[in-house]
Amino acid sequence: MATMTVQEQGDAQEGVGAGGVPVEVAASYRARTRGLLGRDGIDGALMITPCNSVHTFRMRFAIDVAYLDKEFRVVDVVTMKPGRLGMIRPRARHVLEAEAGAMAGWGLRPGVRVALRP
């Protein structure tokens, strides 16, 4: 489990609480394939890497999806309802998934940088 903070022009802005946002990292093929399928929600976010597109087939809840480039800068943020296929983002190398509405509260928007720490 890692912790995420949002950085804007070199200044760190903490996410949820003083410790940032808890992030699960899905880097293996099996973990990337499973993603958030079968869950009723998530506390924090899930980072899928490498990844540049997602779907919400068989999902039980709507999610926010942030596409990150190789430097962890946000390329795009979208909200997806269950049963949708997201567009491929060629510049994206990583994807963050969270419950719908969470990313706006964390300050995630195109152009900001995400920092992960153990």
Could you tell me what each predicted segment is?
Residues 1-118:
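Compact, glycine-rich, soluble single-domain proteins
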